Structure formats: structure tokens, C-alpha cells
A protein has these predicted regions:
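Sec-dependent N-terminal signal peptides
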Residues: 2-12
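Residues within alpha-helical transmembrane segments of multi-pass membrane proteins, especially transporters
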Residues: 11-14, 116
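Serine-esterase "nucleophile elbow" of acetyl-processing enzymes
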Residues: 17-72, 84-93
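Short histidine/acidic/glycine/proline-rich micro-motifs that form metal-
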Residues: 39-44, 72-76, 104-106, 144-147
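Short alpha-helical
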Residues: 49, 76, 159
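Alpha-helical cap/lid subdomain in secreted, periplasmic
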Residues: 53-64, 80-178
Length: 178
């Protein structure tokens, strides 16, 4: 389901002119770089089905015009993501960034405040836009109703996701609210 939401967002959302640049350039035959940057939902084999499906669908339609990088890392949150943003993301010069860390920021052992996810997302958006003002940026957040141990370790997930919603609105980027 997250795969379909992202795919639909990339092809139909026109929040700002920059949000359509990725697709316009692909249609013109220009090469584009896609970077996935998240936690377990984007990297673990059992969770990243949506990443693989999106990649397959884009490759099928645009064949050799796209380079993909999955720079995600399991068990990390926005602190690691911001500290490693230059090496993990900016070094690859993405035209499309799909990222999200609120599900791990909300884990109680990390001792983060809910506003933290949104502020870190803003930092990453600002840094990518400084490098590539035309980059298409997609921020994803996961279900506010996690099950089992995930629910126990993330009692304030809704507040963390809310800070990401605010950041996406403030920065004019695509939000996939799964």
C-alpha cells in the first residue's frame, strides 16, 4: 500500500513546480537519481517490498534513465540520519529523495521529543534543496497503530508523525501518510 501511495504521489502531486521536475526530466529522457533513506521499513528484506516494487515499476517505465540507491539503515533514527546525510544522501546527488525516520525516533529508548522528527526532516529538506532546488522530496510516515512490541516501544508515535506532517506542510514536500 505504501508503494502505491508513493507512486501516485510522484506522478500526480504538484504541490510546487519542483515536485514535478523529477517526472518531467524522466519524460525528456534525462537521467535521474533516486535515493531511499529510512529505517527498517525501507531496508529489511521483509519490510522493503514497497521499495522493490517502486523501483521495479519505475525501471519498467523508464529503463536505464534511473539510478537507485537505498541508503537506509535498520535500527536508526533522525539523529543518525542527519549526522550521515551528507555522505549517505547528498554525495549521491538525488533528484528524488524518499525518506522517513519517525517510527524509530518515537522509540522510547532514544529519548527524543516528538518535535524532533519534524525538525530533523526540515534539516534534511533544507540541505537537499541547497544542493538541488529542483529535487522532488517525499517524506513517509508509518501507521500510528503499531502492533505488539512496536506499540509498547512507541507510545507517542502519533505525536512524532504529527511533527513530520507539520514539517512536510511547512516545506511544501510530498507526504505519504501510511
Amino acid at each position: 500500500r505504501i508503494f502505491l501511495l508513493i507512486l501516485i504521489s510522484i506522478f500526480t502531486v504538484s504541490i510546487a513546480s519542483a515536485q514535478t521536475t523529477f517526472l518531467k526530466k524522466l519524460k525528456k529522457g534525462e537521467k535521474q537519481t533516486v535515493v531511499f533513506y529510512g529505517a527498517s521499513a525501507a531496508i529489511n528484506t521483509s519490510n522493503r517490498v514497497w521499495v522493490d516494487q517502486l523501483r521495479t515499476r519505475l525501471e519498467r517505465r523508464f529503463s536505464e534513465k534511473i539510478t537507485f540507491y537505498n541508503c537506509s539503515k535498520s535500527g536508526i533514527g533522525s539523529f543518525w540520519a542527519t549526522e550521515n546525510f551528507k555522505d549517505s544522501v547528498l554525495s549521491r546527488k538525488p533528484d528524488l529523495l524518499i525518506f522517513g525516520f519517525s517510527e524509530n525516533d518515537a522509540v522510547t529508548r532514544f529519548n527524543n521529543a516528538p518535535w524532533y522528527s519534524g525538525k530533523c526532516a526540515e534539516y534534511m529538506v533544507d540541505n537537499l534543496r541547497a544542493q538541488n532546488p529542483d529535487a522532488t522530496i517525499v517524506l513517509y510516515i508509518l501507521s500510528e497503530r503499531p502492533l505488539g512490541q512496536s506499540a509498547e516501544t512507541r507510545p507517542e508515535l502519533a505525536a512524532f508523525n504529527a511533527s513530520c506532517r507539520e514539517a512536510a506542510k511547512k516545506k511544501g514536500i510530498i507526504l505519504v501518510d501510511y
